[in-house]
UniProtKB/Swiss-Prot annotation:
It comes from Prototheca wickerhamii. PANTHER family: 30S 40S RIBOSOMAL PROTEIN, SMALL RIBOSOMAL SUBUNIT PROTEIN US4M. Its main location: mitochondrion. It is found in: Mitochondrion. This is Small ribosomal subunit protein uS4m.
Length: 511
């Protein structure tokens, strides 16, 4: 039995039309007939579902697919919010790492499959129709592998280490100056490494270090900053100046530090320039000795103390004598080239009595004197052979040991010097304190006197070898004169020995 829509209620007909519009079905409303009551029940259910939606939304929507899209968008927005809440930063980082690792593994497996397949075909000698040979293919594939993140980090590390090594080797050059040299070396024709080293070795501070005038490059820079170095007779305060062939480098003359020209004239007035070198040295030495004798007359008391503190402490050739002719605080400059002094002091010397027959020694309370030699030859002879106190110039009983049978002068000398330091305190307390400090060190240095003499003899022999080594290790790219304290720069060195490995061509990539 066919039922037309006209027989139904008007409300049900409207619902059916809206359903047809939503389902995009092309059906004539007039031709539709409901054969069973089940269809009516379906319409009622659809009615309830449609009424649940908002009326405004149903009027605006013309297609059921648009409604589905809107629902999906709403679900995505809600799902994103849930994702942010559920995952923390640590889980995100782990998730991203796992993604990267999986992608790398996929690429690695693909590359392995390609390589093994090609190698298997080559081994089986099967023909492969490729645009280019297999070796080129494998070579290009290796290039793509090296362009990964790990290879880039290694290159950066090598560049950084290379820069640090060069900075430390050349006295911690600033990065700006090093970058300038690299740019200049790149612009120059020829090899990059040769240009780089030739430019660095032309720097003023490096040249001073190579010449041997300074111990370090930092000391050379300090000398430049203190305006102690001249380049072509002009003050140069910039240590990074690049020299050219023929430039003359010289130190500041010590005579320039003198304020007046009169002092200079007085120094050079007594020297005859027309005489030969040996005669000049003799004339100068005689006139210097005359000047010293004139200064001795001015400051006799201070000179006595200075000579005593400087030379008498390490000399064991002292002798005590009773000379009642001299007065206190008097100095005489005899023809025998000896300085003698007479100082008032009352002292006694105690030596312990024991089974080894030590005796008690007393000194007369008269004006005694200490005498010592000035010149080095006599001092060395006295140090090499330990002299006992002379018998004629003393009123002291000799002490003998059973083991050595020698006179022990050290204890007597030490106690005489302590009393002498006490007598000086009224005159100058500073020198007395210095002398007391030296005396404390003498006990440890008693046996070192003979060792020092051997060192002096060895040093004289070693100086010969040092001079030979200096001639061998003298740089060939510089003309050095120790007499005038000047250097002539000829050219940059042709060979440089580095204590480490450096690949300077890597630095070219960083530019």
């Amino acid at each position: 039995m066919k039922i037309s829509l006209k027989c139904l209620n008007t409300h049900t007909a409207e619902i059916y039309r809206k359903c047809l519009l939503l389902s995009d079905s092309t059906v004539n409303v007039s031709s539709v007939d409901f054969t069973n009551q089940s269809k009516l029940n379906l319409l009622k259910q659809e009615k309830k579902s449609i009424e649940s939606f908002n009326k405004n939304s149903l009027l605006n929507i013309s297609n059921f697919r648009d409604l589905e899209r809107q629902e999906k968008d709403i679900q995505k927005k809600t799902s994103k919010k849930v994702y942010k809440k559920s995952y923390s930063r640590s889980t995100k980082s782990i998730y991203s790492r796992t993604k990267i690792i999986n992608e790398r593994n996929k690429l690695h497996t693909l590359n392995q499959q390609i390589i093994f397949s090609t190698l298997a075909r080559i081994h089986l000698k099967k023909k492969i129709n490729l645009l280019f040979p297999v070796q080129e293919f494998l070579f290009e594939l290796s290039k793509h592998r090296n362009k990964s993140a790990g290879s880039k980090s290694r290159e950066y590390l090598e560049i950084l280490l290379c820069v640090k090594k060069l900075k430390m080797f050349y006295g911690f050059i600033p990065l700006k100056q090093l970058h300038k040299i690299l740019v200049q070396a790149k612009a120059m024709p020829g090899y990059f490494s040769k240009n780089f080293f030739s430019l660095i070795e032309k720097r003023l501070d490096v040249v001073l270090y190579r010449s041997g005038f300074t111990k370090t490059i930092v000391a050379a820079r300090q000398a430049c900053r203190h305006s102690q170095i001249y380049v072509n007779s002009k003050v140069c305060r910039i240590p990074s100046t690049i020299l050219e062939s023929g430039d003359i480098i010289s130190y500041k003359n010590q005579l320039d530090s003198l304020k007046t020209a009169e002092i200079k004239n007085n120094l050079f007035s007594n020297i005859n320039t027309n005489v030969s070198g040996n005669e000049v040295s003799n004339n100068v030495s005689n006139k210097v000795s005359n000047k010293i004798s004139s200064t001795l007359a001015l400051n006799k008391q201070s000179l006595l103390l200075l000579l005593f503190c400087a030379k008498s402490i390490y000399n064991e050739s002292f002798f005590v004598s009773n000379k009642r002719k001299f007065k206190s605080n008097e100095v005489t400059f005899d023809n025998k080239k000896e300085i003698t002094s007479a100082i008032d002091y009352t002292k006694y010397l105690q030596i312990k009595n024991s089974r080894k027959k030590y005796k008690l020694i007393t000194l007369n309370n008269n004006l005694d004197s200490l005498s010592f030699n000035i010149f080095d030859k006599e001092i060395l002879n006295s140090l090499s052979s330990k002299q006992n106190l002379p018998v004629n110039k003393q009123n002291i009983v000799e002490i003998e040991n059973k083991k050595t049978n020698k006179f022990n002068t050290f204890s007597l000398l030490f106690q005489n010097l302590t009393s002498f330091s006490k007598s000086i305190e009224s005159y100058s307390s500073v020198l007395a304190l210095k002398l007391q400090d030296h005396l404390l060190n003498i006990k440890g240095k008693r046996n070192e006197v003979s060792k020092n003499i051997n060192k002096i003899e060895r040093s004289q022999k070693d100086n010969v070898f040092i001079n030979i080594l200096q001639k061998i290790n003298r740089p060939t790219h510089l003309e050095i004169s120790s007499i005038t304290n000047s250097i002539i720069f000829l050219y940059s060195p042709q060979r440089i020995y580095l204590p480490f490995y450096v690949d300077i061509d890597i630095l070219r990539k960083s530019l």
